[in-house]
Swiss-Prot record:
Binding residues for GTP: 14-19, 131-134
Organism: Wigglesworthia glossinidia brevipalpis
Protein's name according to its UniProt entry: Elongation factor 4
Positions of the tr-type G domain: 2-184
Catalytic activity: GTP + H2O = GDP + phosphate + H(+)
Similarity remark: Belongs to the TRAFAC class translation factor GTPase superfamily. Classic translation factor GTPase family. LepA subfamily.
Domain of life of the native organism: Bacteria
Subcellular location: Cell membrane
EC numbers on record: 3.6.5.n1
Amino acid sequence: MENIRNFSIIAHINHGKSTLSDRLIQICGNISNREMSNQILDTMDLERERGITIKAQSVRLNYKAKNKKNYQLNLIDTPGHADFSYEVSRSLSACEGALLIIDSSQGIEAQTIANFYCAIEMKIKIIPVLNKIDLPNSDPDKISKEIESMMGIKSKEIIKCSAKTGYGVYEILENIVCNLTPPIGNINKPLQALIIDSWFDNYLGIIVLIRIKNGNLKNGEKIIVMSTKKVYSIAQMGFFSPNKTKTDILKCGEVGWIACSIKEIKGAPVGDTITLASYPSEKMLPGFKKIFPKVFASIFPTISEKYQSLKNGLIKLSLNDSSLFYEYENSDSLGMGFRCGFLGLLHMDIVKERLEREYQIELIITEPTVIYEILKKDNTKIHVKSPSKIPNKKYINELREPIVNCKILSPKKYLGKIISLCVEKRGIQNNLIYLENKVIIIYIIPMSEIILDFFDKLQSISNGYASLDYKFKCFNKTDSVVIQTYINKKLIDSLTKVINKNYINLYSKKTIENLKKIIPRQQFDIVIHIKINNKIISKGIVKQVRKNVLEKCYGGDVSRKKKLLKKQKIGKKRMKKIGNFFLPQDSLFSILNIKKNKK
């Protein structure tokens, strides 16, 4: 174990994390120049196209240091986007150290700070790295001072590098060897292996990524997943180099994968402990906090016949993504689909795009909402994932919405505009921290205000220089209300929303205006009602189309005309009573703010 080093690379999105991983792999000779490609650890097409890391990946590197000793370096690459911050904490739990990468042209950003404190809380040794020093607009000295004032890291400890050209990468490798401690563990103790991640393989079933904390694990041995007490026999095991490489043993301190015919992802819960059936451990390792979805949206196929394909796609995606939640939903207006839970808007976008690409399904995805906590009259609490499922007010004591602690890092000159935006979004100021050229703005804001257009507006008013990080804080009582839309006395469930009292008039007025534009006129009036607690707060009418029944009456007796008009009047009454209007789905999408993306 003396020559093993386990480390992660953590950074804000687009600070050069994957490029540095590529360079480390190339220098350690794990892959030939012919096989080398950009973002080699980003195996999904989506990761390469978007230039982001979505799933944490691991690779074993062999490095001969200046002291002539050979070292095994286990690198776990991590995502940079805030939506996937849970992957960062999971990766760090398998490591003794981390490279904190900061772009020398952009400086410290919100997610940089979040990752830094996450590593500090987990007592991870940090090696600070200033990347992209080859860029013309990089300012290493200025950013070094920024790091020193914000994080307390001395400038002389910061390594300057360019992952693109390879400058400074050898210095990083030497720092990993010299400054990170080897793993702590006992080879003679009962096996304790932490499950870092798990995913589905078409041939091997569930593959489990583990870090051996104590003991050794050999191929063919029987293991116990400690939370379920289920016993499995190891069929294959190995490590990534970055290609999947088989081995017969994983030793104390190492990171590797095992395949043991586990059929579903629940069979190997992330954060669980694996031990030997023949020599079991009595204690489980400390796991991870359970991840709960933050954002919910409904997904429907545009063609109802594709429902089964959508169901199969979600089942398979959830095998590789334990944070994806879904349940069956049937909407009167949109048909059969699923209510899905995501970690954030990027996570939602990734899932949608993977479903469309990998399963050839054209999808409709509704406007995202948050989960609400309800304190009922009998003092029981329930959590509701969809506004249409919120009970009637007479059964509710309190409606509570999720509140987030929102940190914004921005140049000082945009402070006024950002504060105005936060106030507009019902934010309460918690703190302002002034730095040399920047300011950290901390606000408590309802999550429902964050998940729609907050980030886009923030980028717009700061010319793209502000960065955002937010974490769930608690559920707070809200004065928001459930608004329902009825068309000809029929509830349109997909138009049920939770709206803050300040926006009720604006929302109801806009909804009626938009519906009047898109509902096709019939031979009877179509009445639109906006209701709160069954009380009508706004009304609109799509006027009927008048059919000229006298068109063929060229003159003649007036009584004949009166008879035809009376007959028409009776017919219209009957049509209004039993007639169904047709509301085109495309029209409904525009009202719902729904994203409908074609392939």
